[in-house]
Amino acid sequence: MPREIITLQLGQCGNQIGFEFWKQLCAEHGISPEGIVEEFATEGTDRKDVFFYQADDEHYIPRAVLLDLEPRVIHSILNSPYAKLYNPENIYLSEHGGGAGNNWASGFSQGEKIHEDIFDIIDREADGSDSLEGFVLCHSIAGGTGSGLGSYLLERLNDRYPKKLVQTYSVFPNQDEMSDVVVQPYNSLLTLKRLTQNADCVVVLDNTALNRIATDRLHIQNPSFSQINQLVSTIMSASTTTLRYPGYMNNDLIGLIASLIPTPRLHFLMTGYTPLTTDQSVASVRKTTVLDVMRRLLQPKNVMVSTGRDRQTNHCYIAILNIIQGEVDPTQVHKSLQRIRERKLANFIPWGPASIQVALSRKSPYLPSAHRVSGLMMANHTSISSLFERTCRQYDKLRKREAFLEQFRKEDMFKDNFDEMDTSREIVQQLIDEYHAATRPDYISWGTQEQ
């Protein structure tokens, strides 16, 4: 029985990565840009109905809700070849179309005003599912709509659908170059509070690392957003292959999440993908074996989160799930796992078993692939806290000088005080502390003694 998943795309970034994601899914399932199953797509082994449903005339429609406070990106989607794919009733653009001006508070308070319209769409979509498993939210944490409206939606989804899973694909801003959004640290911190408290699982897409991978590995000089978004859609589609081409394990979202998240707050995941090549000539030379793929996944240069090396803390893996696609002999997997353990290629937590799991998944029969085997690693690693520390440092700098707070004062939430920011800062600090605690053997009893 398929457990359906509803995708919510928010703001410029969320809609752009969502668009690439659906493009990729259509290609993998042999669905044309209009939603019609192609003549050649005759294999019935994939489950399309987790992410799509069929309209009366048999064509497939994504279970997606497209939301934005300004029209530009959604209009470009509606002028693309994929315009007819989406259900037009599931597209919401705010009336005045002014956007949230890269301001979290504006996005959040607009959410309060329009929440009935938005939840009409979401509830209708949820009622149309036989057994809804949960929601996937695509957004960025630095702007206004993805962060503010995203935060508002996360809170409301918890109230309205307390038993449903909420997974997010959250894009973190690029730290290598100056941001064009001066209030980015405020936006990020306020969103992080919601991601900590209201999401079950957050897949961190770090623009810093994605840009580095595009330049170093794919040899693109100045990667454009659309090239980065292609990387993101590769990750998103690979992380859902076990749901769409079901095997024995991990064939629903809770199965994926349960194997990676042993303690509820430490639910921020990083991803790695290999082989990353756009260049066909290189691709054909390499022999990709399971061990190759699994070893490469553990190399920092393939991991899509840029974390500083912290000498004081022994950062370690809490859990790893490798999704291996392609022609794989299961005995090879066992050997590779043994090799990784023997050679101690990965450093695991001292308070629990070394949890490294492998899910085997088929590749799409309709896409020619340059590699025999490719792999996605989803890892729960304590060094992700360095990403939050960076956000906190930037936030503290601005907050100390009370810089750029006028834009926030305009909204009711911050009219009298900035308590919301200060509590968010505390919650993110607790999250960082817990990640540090998880590197020590006494983490099991952490939080039980009086501190």
From Swiss-Prot:
GO biological process: cytoplasmic microtubule organization; meiotic spindle organization; microtubule cytoskeleton organization; microtubule nucleation; mitotic cell cycle; mitotic sister chromatid segregation; mitotic spindle organization
GO MF term (any one): identical protein binding
Keywords, sorted A to Z: Cytoplasm, Cytoskeleton, Disease variant, GTP-binding, Lissencephaly, Microtubule, Nucleotide-binding, Phosphoprotein
Chain positions recorded as GTP binding sites: 142-148
Superkingdom, taxonomy of origin: Eukaryota
Residue list for modification Phosphoserine: 131
Cited InterPro entries: Gamma_tubulin, Tub_FtsZ_C, Tubulin, Tubulin/FtsZ-like_C, Tubulin/FtsZ_2-layer-sand-dom, Tubulin/FtsZ_GTPase_sf, Tubulin_C, Tubulin_CS
SMART domains according to UniProt: Tubulin, Tubulin_C
Subcellular localization(s) per the UniProt record: Cytoplasm, Cytoskeleton, Microtubule organizing center, Centrosome; Cytoplasm, Cytoskeleton, Spindle
PTM (free text): Phosphorylation at Ser-131 by BRSK1 regulates centrosome duplication, possibly by mediating relocation of gamma-tubulin and its associated proteins from the cytoplasm to the centrosome.
Cellular component GO terms, alphabetical: apical part of cell; cell leading edge; centriole; centrosome; ciliary basal body; condensed nuclear chromosome; cytoplasm; cytoplasmic microtubule
One Pfam family from the record: Tubulin_C
Family according to the record: Belongs to the tubulin family.
Record disease entry: Cortical dysplasia, complex, with other brain malformations 4: A disorder of aberrant neuronal migration and disturbed axonal guidance. Clinical features include early-onset seizures, microcephaly, spastic tetraplegia, and various malformations of cortical development, such as agyria, posterior or frontal pachygyria, thick cortex, and subcortical band heterotopia and thin corpus callosum in some patients.
Complex and partners: Component of the gamma-tubulin ring complex (gTuRC) consisting of TUBGCP2, TUBGCP3, TUBGCP4, TUBGCP5 and TUBGCP6 and gamma-tubulin TUBG1 or TUBG2. TUBGCP2, TUBGCP3, TUBGCP4, TUBGCP5 and TUBGCP6 assemble in a 5:5:2:1:1 stoichiometry; each is associated with a gamma-tubulin, thereby arranging 14 gamma-tubulins in a helical manner. Gamma-tubulin at the first position is blocked by TUBGCP3 at the last position, allowing 13 protafilaments to grow into a microtubule.
Job description of the protein: Tubulin is the major constituent of microtubules, protein filaments consisting of alpha- and beta-tubulin heterodimers. Gamma-tubulin is a key component of the gamma-tubulin ring complex (gTuRC) which mediates microtubule nucleation. The gTuRC regulates the minus-end nucleation of alpha-beta tubulin heterodimers that grow into microtubule protafilaments, a critical step in centrosome duplication and spindle formation.
Protein name in the entry: Tubulin gamma-1 chain
Organism: Homo sapiens (Human)
Species lineage: Eukaryota, Metazoa, Chordata, Craniata, Vertebrata
Gene label: TUBG1
